[in-house]
């Protein structure tokens, strides 16, 4: 068997997340069906992670195993002809059999986009804050995250995680215009809803609803009910996966 990595991106607006769902169309199902049609065999793929409903990916990786070698450029071309316009395949390449799209990934990077002035051209891919935000204080909060490893406070209640420990490599706010920013976070792994809950908590900080000391306490106690809300998925992008 030969293992292949597929590198692709998607606009998640029309999908119920990455993972196959019984009552909604997923990115995984759409890509698997296209591969199965072209290769004339049932194909199963494994993704680098699971994005939720409405979340996008500028870079996602998945792997599949095939008994016969394929022409990667030709398959890439055929997939892009068959897939809907909101999914695009960049590249397909053979990899060692011990490479795994999910478990071999060392770092994943997400960005969450926010704007503070009404803008019809940003509304589908950025969260419009109805409140003024103190981004200097939010940057202090982002820096604080790198000093912690247990993020139970930002994990969806009832999620089946074996551990809530994560290593944060990068956590920062980046200003892109006088009224738009994005939060960028890179970690070895992410918990369910972790990025959206993190942003929701940093927004509480930016609104002066909580203090840096409160954020420290929330992280140490690991109480999800004390943290901020899970922000809408339409403004969240999986930006990169590193191996």
Predicted feature locations:
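Structured-RNA-binding interfaces characteristic of tRNA pseudouridine synthases
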Residues: 1-243
